[in-house]
From Swiss-Prot:
Component of the PR-DUB complex. Gene3D superfamilies: 1.20.58.860, Peptidase C12, ubiquitin carboxyl-terminal hydrolase. This is Ubiquitin carboxyl-terminal hydrolase BAP1. The lineage of its organism: Eukaryota, Metazoa, Chordata, Craniata, Vertebrata. One of its GO terms (cellular component) is PR-DUB complex. InterPro entries: Papain-like_cys_pep_sf (IPR038765), Peptidase_C12_UCH (IPR001578), Peptidase_C12_UCH_sf (IPR036959), UCH_C (IPR041507). SUPFAM superfamilies: Cysteine proteinases. GO terms for biological process: cranial skeletal system development; heterochromatin formation; negative regulation of DNA-templated transcription; Notch signaling pathway; protein deubiquitination; protein K48-linked deubiquitination; regulation of cell cycle; regulation of cell growth. It comes from Danio rerio (Zebrafish). Residues 342-351 have a biased composition (Pro residues).
Length: 755
């Protein structure tokens, strides 16, 4: 076995496939392109390739002395896996085994497990012989090597002896017992580079040592222009991305269940309101014989909940006019009360400009300038309507329908219209007219139309199958037409490119030119089709999904850091929390690629995170180290994130905050699906390159030549090529050799004839 080991190329795909052939699972090899940037943890070890020049090689052979960095203690050397390289061209396998067999927590497989158990306590020379006499390792090694060219005997005379002595050599850098060791099979002992700092990782010290070695950090290295390559042995990215996708999809289902729970509470409240309206309609129909004056007194004597002002009949009529429909929308038109005699009301006179009710955007969008069209601005200026909005009360399930979806119809002469509107919503003073019944019928019709539109849109998206989102099953329940949302939450095959600004699809003011250019040009987050559908069901199609800015990102601040590593929990009272496992806080220290991009996108100018919408984040193939995977750095995280993430009780969030968290989860799912797809495609490319590298083309060449001979074309081709070479060679030789002799021969006879 001492002969026949072939040279291996320094290629991460080759080493990854070699690790798989050894039987190791959950490990891959990646190439490091930049020594200045921080490496993503965890890293099992580094494999460093450099050019082994004759001068250096001779010096190493002569220099058998031990320097101060060499470890000569036999107990320490024999305790680690350090083997002398006794076979030529086996340095690649030696470097890989030095990393794998000195690392705990790696599933080695049967071959390497037996090797590690057999060589335990051996000296470096005995371990080197054990590697050389392992046929499994030699077979796996040579299966990924390029076939050596067969040199003809006459061609070997021109090869320089100096050039044959130049070669490349692999060494490994491994952390062992909190110290950095350099394991070189051509050295007698391991090299101890010492411990690393408290505030750094072992990879930081290894990068410094490698930079000093190749002459980047110091100018004393004579071979500063040496060719080198650096590879890292890291965990398999596919397993990591699959586990994160599994957790994210479970958390998406939990958030959808929380939204469904809120929706069911809304349906129950609307059912109670409908039953109360029906009861009052029956009471009003049975008491039609009573004089109108008595009814007016009953209206005035209706009890009002404690803590509220006494409403006048006019205020009660205004409040009743804004009764919510079953779809959850506030109706802005009010019907005047009939006179006592039952006569039709007089024709309405044009109201002065101070009392004009301007049709406005919903309350949660009205104070945003970018959500208004220029025509809306002109109407506001003409009507004298201010943009200021009083602060919102804390979230409550009872106030959900009124605080989130109440329409702001302010007038210049009335300052407490919102208070009167809430009083009108809660007192239910309409006992005489059929306004409640008409509103209920209109609400049922609007809700049925909304349900039909949602069903058609879901069917259309399922037929196209281009968004890759999970379809929502929408059905109506009961006589009130409540909507139930269910989702299968299956993995989407491709990330969605659909815009989450659902209002832009129905022609609202979201595409207003007043939106600032900075927000338009900012990097946006991937779309969330599931959140889009849920937003339409919860808030109505006309209002659209609200832009989830800093006011609605409380759930993202609390749970966004842990949503990809910890499963969320939902209680019966609607409280959502994340159990803080040990790996959740450890994940905060791990920095890297993708999640860092997300946090940079989601952080506003003031440091506040902001969930944005738009197409998927673009990926670069070089970023697919988990620096590819990009987690936020610990120092960049707000302190409230860590504090809130460790709170076991959890919090209760509004529907808009849950939608913001749902969009965040959908964005993570889309990104990790892209990363997983890239890793799978990378493995396929590794196998294709390996087949091209190791393929023996001799059989194909022999078959092709035999086919040419059978067709009678081989002789003519050979004769044609040989004749061309002879003609070119002979003509050139004669021109150079016969010029001077011809001149001499011709000159002598010419002179003789003249004489």
């Amino acid at each position: 076995m001492n002969k026949g080991w072939l040279e291996l190329e320094s290629d991460p795909g080759l080493f990854t496939l070699l690790v798989e052939d050894f039987g190791v699972k959950g490990v891959q090899v990646e190439e490091i392109y930049d020594l200045q940037s921080k490496c993503q943890s965890p890293v099992y070890g580094f494999i460093f390739l450099f050019k082994w020049i004759e001068e250096r090689r001779s010096r190493r052979k002569v220099s058998t002395l031990v320097d101060e960095t060499s470890v000569i203690d036999d107990d320490i050397v024999n305790d680690m896996f350090f083997a002398h390289q006794l076979i030529p061209n086996s340095c690649a396998t030696h470097a890989l085994l030095s990393v794998l067999l000195n690392c705990s927590g790696v599933e080695l497989g049967m071959t390497l497990s037996r090797m590690k158990a057999f060589t335990k306590g051996f000296n470096p020379e005995s371990k080197g012989y054990a590697i050389g006499n392992a046929p499994e390792l030699a077979k796996a090694h040579n299966s990924h090597a390029r076939p050596e060219p067969r040199h003809l005997p006459e061609k070997q005379n021109g090869i320089s002896a100096v050039r044959t002595m130049e070669a490349f050599h692999f060494v490994s850098y491994v952390p062992i017992k909190d110290r950095l060791f350099e394991l070189d099979g051509l050295k007698a002992y391991p090299i101890d580079h010492g411990p690393w700092g408290e505030d750094e990782e072992w990879t930081d010290k290894a990068r410094r040592v490698i930079m000093e070695r190749i002459g980047l950090a110091t100018a004393g290295e004579p071979y500063h222009d040496i060719r080198f390559n650096l590879m890292a042995v890291v965990p398999d990215r596919r397993i990591k991305y699959e586990s994160k996708l599994d957790i994210l999809k479970r958390n998406r289902q939990i958030i959808l269940e929380g939204l469904q729970q809120i929706r069911e509470k809304k349906v129950i409240r609307m059912t109670q309101q409908e039953s109360g309206q029906d009861r009052k309609q029956q009471d009003s129909s049975s008491s039609e014989d009573t004089p109108p004056v008595v009814k007016k007194e009953e209206v005035q004597e209706t009890p009002i909940p404690s803590g509220a002002e006494q409403a006048t009949p006019t205020e009660a009529q205004e409040g009743a006019a804004s009764l919510p429909s079953p779809a959850g929308k506030v109706r802005s038109m009010a019907k005047p009360a009939l006179p006592a005699g039952g006569a039709p009301p007089p024709a309405p006179l044009p109201a002065p400009s101070t009392n004009t009710i301007v049709q406005r955007l919903p309350a949660f969008l009205d104070n945003h300038n970018y959500a208004k069209s220029p025509m809306q601005e002109e109407e506001d200026l003409a009507a004298g309507v201010g943009r200021s909005r009083p602060p919102q009360p804390p979230y409550s399930d009872d106030e959900d329908d009124y605080d989130d979806e109440e329409e702001e119809c302010s007038t210049a002469g009335v300052t407490n219209s919102r208070v009167r509107r809430k009083l009108g919503l809660r007192t239910r003073t309409m006992s005489r007219t059929a306004v409640g019944g008409v509103a209920a019928m209109e609400g049922q019709l609007a809700l049925s139309v909304l349900a039909e539109k949602l069903k058609k849109e879901v069917q259309r998206k399922d037929a196209l199958a281009t968004t890759g989102s999970t379809p929502l099953n929408v059905r109506t329940e009961g006589r009130t037409g409540g909507i139930s949302i269910t989702s299968a939450c299956q993995p989407s095959p491709t990330p969605s490119n659909e815009s989450t600004d659902t209002a832009s699809e129905i022609g609202s003011a979201f595409n207003s030119p007043l939106r600032s250019p900075a927000r338009s040009q900012a990097t946006t987050r991937p779309s969330s089709p599931v959140a889009s559908h849920v937003g339409r069901v919860l808030f109505g199609e006309e209002e659209g999904l609200p832009r989830l800015d800093a006011r609605h990102n409380r759930a993202v601040r609390d749970l966004g850091v842990l949503v990809s590593s910890t499963q969320l929990q939902l209680q019966e009272d609607g409280v959502i929390f994340a159990l803080p496992p040990t790996e959740a806080l450890e994940g905060l220290k791990k920095v890297g690629g993708v999640d860092k991009k997300k946090k940079e996108e989601a952080s506003g100018p003031g440091g506040e995170e902001e969930v944005k919408e738009g197409p998927s984040v673009e990926m670069k193939a070089e970023d697919v180290k988990e620096s590819v995977d990009v987690k936020p750095e610990k120092e960049n995280l707000p302190t409230t994130d860590v504090e809130n993430s460790t709170k076991p009780p959890g919090e209760k969030y509004t529907p808009k905050e849950l939608l913001a968290l749902l969009k965040y989860v959908e964005a993570d799912i889309a990104n990790y699906e892209v990363y997983l797809k890239e890793e799978v495609e990378k493995r396929k490319k590794y196998k294709i390159d390996d087949q091209r590298r190791t393929h023996n083309y001799d059989e194909f060449i022999c078959t092709f030549i035999s086919m040419l001979a059978q067709e009678g074309m081989l002789a003519s081709l050979v004769e044609q090529n040989i004749s061309v070479r002879r003609r070119q060679g002979v003509s050139i030789g004669r021109l150079h050799k016969q010029r001077k002799p011809d001149r001499r021969k011709r000159s002598r006879p010419y002179k003789a004839k003249r004489q």
